[in-house]
Structures are given as structure tokens and as C-alpha cells.
Amino acid sequence: VPFTGDKRIFTADLFYDTQNKERADIYRQYIWNVLDATADAPNVYQSVSEEYTGPAHFVEFWLDCIASWQQKTGRKARVVLNTTHDVALSVMSKPSYAALVDIVEIEQWYYHGRKLYAPEGGKNLAPRQHLRLTRTTNPDFADIYQTVSEAVAAFPGKAVLYYAKAF
């Protein structure tokens, strides 16, 4: 049964199931359509989602679709990776995927009080739900500096963006 005692229904596993051929074909067509529509716009960067908290395998599927589109069309997509910390580390540790990413955006992990807030991907929780569980404090400048510095070191050669409502 895909729900818990509080009656939340979890459908993310179905959504992110790229082993389902029909669903994977629909996703691939959608991704390619978006790439076709925006490829000539130099100010457009592709992102898997604004608040992506899904699993790494779906991001890899998305990047595989981008790579196959680039190979078929000879065009270059500009890609920003906006995921949870564990998913970003997993994806960027694979050279073929890291080569596709132009920018790593930090929105869903950060230091606060020198402790890392980094919810795991694929846990059926939106960013706001993760925050309610942990009740973190707002990061100060030193926390942000540490977060960005570590990302720059972890992802050499990539632009790093940091987003937070407080700054």
C-alpha cells in the first residue's frame, strides 16, 4: 500500500521508474522537445527540476537523454544540476555525466552552525518537508562560504551557484 498512517500517498517511485518503457519513452520525448525548443537560446539552461529531491538514477536518465540528443543533433545543451547533495555527488562522480553539467546549483544543502544540512534524495519528501523535520537555523556568511568553497573544490571546472532565501 503506497501510503502511511497519515494518509500521504507516495507516487514518486512510480514517477521515477524509468524501467517502464512507455513512461521512459514519454520522458525522453518530453526532454527532447524541450531541448529542441530551447537549444538556440543562449540564456536557457536545462534543469531536471527547481526543487529536485528524487533519486540519482532519474537524473542519470535525464542526462542520458540530453547526451543522446546532443549526439543526434550536434547541438549543445547548457545544463544546471540542482539536486540534493548526495545525488549531486553521485552524478558528478561519473565522468560522462559530469562532462554534461555546466553549473552546479546549491539550493538544497548548506551548512548552518557549521553542521551540514543535506537531505537525501529519493525519500518522498519535498524540501519544505525536510526542513520541517530538522528545524535548521538560517546560515550565516561563514556557513555559506563553507558550502560554496566545498562545492567548488568537489566540482572543479564547474560554475557553482548558491541560492538561499535569506541571502
Q: What residue spans do the PLM features occupy?
A:
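Active-site mouth of glycoside hydrolases
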Residues: 1-92, 96-103, 135, 156
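Catalytic-core region of carbohydrate-active enzymes that cleave or remodel glycosidic bonds
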Residues: 95-167
